């Protein structure tokens, strides 16, 4: 059984099938083509469970969280189709879902909901994005400027790694602290994020994607499309944590019990037989595209398409040279509010 379903089943079992659920889903924009994918999965599982047990459908209050400025209208326009498919999946016209969905803009590292109002929290990739670039790297007079690099790399200084680690730890602690106020005792959270299985991030595969982006940006500097100074002052507010970092922060914050931490390896491109160019396109279709949207404020929106095209080419060449498909490590973390 998927970890998400197991956590929902445990919640329903421990709470005695309540008449209403409140769910918060963080990071629907990380699924640009299917923003309601996780919500569809969760609500269908809950309603089918109630239907199987002969219980009346519970009221489900679902809050979608995204960064300020995100256009929730795109999601809301898809609701009629989603509700129709949900009814079909339940398989009973007499069992009518009672579902209320709303959008809540705001940073996930801060309080967003009333105290003890959430029964279940789901987060997809949101926690990889830092609230800011580590301050030590954004100060032009500071020697920690990550010159010609956009992220942690093999040639980085130890201080660069420490700066990223400290920022992630601070952000993750703030997320846990905020949710500890909002989640009811016995409530669950399932957090999915990319990570790594080695303590040192520099040689890990988690840096590869950003190394390729850095190479693409350097190529555009050489072509005169990007100013070198802009590249030198550009750092990605993103971090893929080590497993022990996740465990340590959960234990340190103290409000949640760690139930499960599952590690999965996922390919950049689903089929091993795909061409190198397809691998390049697949790898840049999500995370890098999100970063380029942010980077457009730094480099200018007119350069985004050129960067996206070049980084796809760089990844395709790397995939062709290595003759093997690159994989990403993904964590699924399940916790219970004490």
Language-model region placement:
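Short catalytic micro-motifs in class I SAM-dependent methyltransferases
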Residues: 125-126, 250
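A conserved beta-strand element that flanks and buttresses the S-adenosyl-L-methionine
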Residues: 122
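Amphipathic alpha-helical protein-protein interaction segments
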Residues: 30-31, 35, 97, 106-107, ...
């Amino acid at each position: 059984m998927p970890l998400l379903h197991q956590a929902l089943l445990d919640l329903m079992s421990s709470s005695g099938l309540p008449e209403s659920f409140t769910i918060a889903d963080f990071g629907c924009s990380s699924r640009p083509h299917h923003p309601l994918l996780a919500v569809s999965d969760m609500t269908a599982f809950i309603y089918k469970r109630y239907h199987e047990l002969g219980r009346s459908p519970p009221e489900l209050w679902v809050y979608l969280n995204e960064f300020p400025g995100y256009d929730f209208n795109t999601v809301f326009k898809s609701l009629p189709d989603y509700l129709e498919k949900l009814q079909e999946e339940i398989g009973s016209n007499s069992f009518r879902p009672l579902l209320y969905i709303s959008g809540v803009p705001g940073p996930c590292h801060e309080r967003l909901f009333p105290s003890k109002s959430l029964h279940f929290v789901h987060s997809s990739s949101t926690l990889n994005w830092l609230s800011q670039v580590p301050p030590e790297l954004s100060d032009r007079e500071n020697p920690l400027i990550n010159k010609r690099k956009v992220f942690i790399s093999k040639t980085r200084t130890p201080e660069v790694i420490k700066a990223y680690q400290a920022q992630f730890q601070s952000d993750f602690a703030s997320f846990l602290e905020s949710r500890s106020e909002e989640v009811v005792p016995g409530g669950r959270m399932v957090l999915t994020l990319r990570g790594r299985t080695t303590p040192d991030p520099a040689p890990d595969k988690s840096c590869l994607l950003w190394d390729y982006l850095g190479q693409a940006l350097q190529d555009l500097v050489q072509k005169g499309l990007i100013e070198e100074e802009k590249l030198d002052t550009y750092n990605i507010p993103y971090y893929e944590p080590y497993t022990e970092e996740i465990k340590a922060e959960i234990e340190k914050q103290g409000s949640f019990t760690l139930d499960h931490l599952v590690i999965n390896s996922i390919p950049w491109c689903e089929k091993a037989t795909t061409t190198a160019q397809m691998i390049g396109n697949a790898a840049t279709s999500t995370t890098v595209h999100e970063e380029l949207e942010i980077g457009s404020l730094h480099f200018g929106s007119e350069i985004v398409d050129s960067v996206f095209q070049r980084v796809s080419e760089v990844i395709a060449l790397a995939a062709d040279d290595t003759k093997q498909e690159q994989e990403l490590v993904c964590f699924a973390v399940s916790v219970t509010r004490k």
